[in-house]
Regions:
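Short alpha-helix within the catalytic core of nucleotide-sugar-dependent glycosyltransferases
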Residues: 118-129
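Conserved N-terminal catalytic core of the sugar/cofactor nucleotidyltransferase
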Residues: 1-7, 14-18, 34-108, 114-119
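Donor nucleotide-sugar binding loop of glycosyltransferases
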Residues: 12, 33, 145
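Conserved donor NDP-sugar-binding/catalytic core segment of glycosyltransferases
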Residues: 131-135
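Single conserved hydrophobic/aromatic residue that forms the stacking wall/gate
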Residues: 137-146
Length: 146
């Protein structure tokens, strides 16, 4: 059974920008020819993954759909977060979607992390796929890396 990716894409980027009026969430910042959200979508365009579920708020719908079109992803589900409540409620709401088979493994990915070695990321998931029921992928915070 394929793994269902759930992309957490509701962050507003307020910790990144001091001027809250003129900021863009880091997952949508254009770094020339790519964004972090775009890279996340590329990572899941692999035969081990089912179509994505994207958890976000209504401010980002247009940007998300633009990225989905650019990556030629036609099948997806968007969950709207009614209020900013951090990660746990977004994970819970995605896990409760009735159309997801009970035994389908889920992987929760943040939309604003850079994973440069996509081949190793996918290889590791594929290697352990038969043991997975749920996986939350996070990377260390900058202060943990020092």
């Amino acid at each position: 059974m394929k793994i269902r990716p759930v992309i957490l894409c509701g962050g507003s980027g307020t910790r990144l920008w001091s001027d809250k009026k003129h900021h863009q969430p880091k997952q949508f910042i254009d770094f020339g020819n790519w964004t972090l959200f775009g890279k996340t979508l590329e990572r899941i365009q692999n035969s081990i993954f089912d179509y994505p579920i994207i958890s976000t708020n209504k401010k980002y719908i247009r940007e998300i759909k633009k990225h989905l079109r650019l990556k030629s992803i036609k099948k997806y589900k968007i969950i709207l977060e009614p209020a900013k409540r951090n990660t746990a409620p977004a994970i819970l709401s995605a896990a409760l979607i009735k159309e997801i088979p009970e035994n389908q493994p889920l992987i929760f990915l943040t939309s604003d992390h850079l994973i440069e070695r996509t081949n190793l990321f996918n290889k590791s998931i594929k290697k352990h796929q038969k043991y997975l029921t749920c996986l939350l992928y996070t990377s260390p915070s900058p202060r943990d890396s020092v």
